[in-house]
């Protein structure tokens, strides 16, 4: 089956034991184009019908059984077609030193019109599972507004939301809740002032985007939160760009991955990077090729600007931030410096407002790590 993406949180140790639970899930489209989905009345999210494959079952047998139990629908077995798979890996919160590994097999299919009574387990009853018909993008929007606190459910919802977006021909975008979870998990792996910097970048990006009619403030905020996510993997230089790009790209978050790449290169030139070139030549070549293929949009430019005015203790004048970088590293490329000044003028013109007034200083963001 064709892999759609791999949602690997990488919040576990290499030595942890993997507990595997393969699952089959149904993409059931009805005549009017809506999907038959399971809705949680308690937590207010949608999931694809389906669940774990039992020993001795093949995938389609498990699919039919799980759909019947969760929705009361009978799948037409001759309609079942492979759609794609998603591998999910994250730390298992129920058992110490274990990893929850779940290969999710998605199938398109149709169902009989008759609906039987559900046969829910205790967890499903407690969650208020019920059958609902809804358009894929509407379901994705509901899921992105969901503020469930449980990390396990959060990743499950993010997984199915990404599949809904792919099914609709869209590039998956993380929700605010998912972006916050990924940042907190990253900071737990590598605590440091980069968390505060990321939060100030996100907050200023959201404010500026809110003053630009063609930009989405929530999307800008999410990109700001995740632009430095590669620092999850340790104290590094150029490696954080490479690692962050691949971490998000593997999850299917192509646009967020792009920001993790472009935020360090306001001129699309890898030679402008300030810091250690601590990745192999093939990885440097990959970055250069990726940059060459990208036509920067306003989100790329916005995060570049906000990254350049955000320190760990707040928003500062652009020149102050660049001088701080120059002092720490001993240099700052003049063309990169000039490009940042151009970005400031560009967004001030779009907003018809002075940059620092728009970006604000705000109170110190809530943090989960320690410098």
What feature does the model see in each segment?
Residues 1-27, 31:
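Acidic, metal-coordinating catalytic segment for phosphate/diphosphate chemistry
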Residues 18, 176-197, 226-232, 266, ...:
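Active-site flanking loop/helix segments enriched in acidic
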Residues 30-70, 74:
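Conserved Nudix-box catalytic region and its N-terminal flanking loop in Nudix hydrolases
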Residues 45, 116-177:
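Nudix hydrolase/Nudix homology domain
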Residues 74-85, 256-259:
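A short coil-to-beta-strand element that immediately follows conserved catalytic motifs
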Residues 210-325:
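Divalent metal-dependent catalytic cores for phosphoryl transfer on phosphate-bearing substrates
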């Amino acid at each position: 089956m064709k892999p759609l993406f791999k949602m690997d949180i990488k919040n576990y140790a290499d030595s942890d034991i993997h507990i595997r639970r393969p699952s089959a899930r149904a993409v059931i489209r009805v005549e009017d184009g809506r999907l038959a989905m399971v809705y949680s009345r308690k937590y207010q999210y949608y999931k694809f019908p389906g669940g774990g494959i039992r020993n001795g079952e093949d995938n389609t047998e498990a699919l039919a059984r799980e759909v019947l139990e969760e929705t009361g629908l009978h799948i037409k077995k001759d309609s079942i077609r492979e759609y794609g798979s998603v591998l999910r890996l994250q730390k298992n919160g129920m058992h110490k030193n274990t990893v929850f590994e779940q290969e999710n097999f998605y199938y398109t299919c149709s169902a009989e019109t008759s609906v039987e009574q559900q046969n829910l387990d205790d967890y499903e009853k407690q969650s208020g599972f019920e059958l609902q018909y809804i358009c894929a993008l509407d379901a994705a929007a509901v899921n992105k507004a969901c503020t469930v606190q449980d990390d396990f459910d959060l990743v499950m919802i993010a997984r199915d939301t990404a599949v809904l977006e792919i099914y609709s021909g869209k590039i998956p975008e993380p929700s605010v809740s998912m972006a916050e979870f990924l940042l907190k998990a990253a900071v737990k792996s590598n605590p440091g002032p980069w968390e505060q910097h990321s939060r100030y970048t996100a907050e200023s990006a959201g404010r500026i985007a809110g003053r630009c009619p063609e930009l989405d403030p929530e999307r800008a905020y999410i990109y700001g939160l995740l632009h430095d996510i590669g620092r999850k993997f340790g104290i590094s230089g150029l490696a954080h760009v490479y690692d962050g790009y691949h971490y998000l790209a593997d999850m299917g978050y192509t646009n967020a991955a792009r920001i993790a790449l472009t935020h360090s290169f306001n001129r699309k030139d890898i030679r402008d990077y300030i810091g250690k070139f601590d990745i192999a030549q093939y990885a440097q070549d990959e970055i250069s090729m990726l940059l060459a293929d990208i036509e920067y949009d306003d989100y790329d430019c916005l995060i570049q600007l906000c990254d350049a005015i955000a320190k760990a203790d707040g928003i500062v004048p652009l020149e102050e931030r660049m001088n701080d970088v120059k002092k720490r590293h001993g240099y700052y490329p003049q063309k990169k410096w000039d490009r940042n000044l151009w970005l400031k003028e560009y967004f001030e013109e779009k907003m018809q407002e002075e940059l620092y007034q728009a970006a604000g200083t705000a109170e110190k963001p809530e943090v989960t790590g320690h410098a």
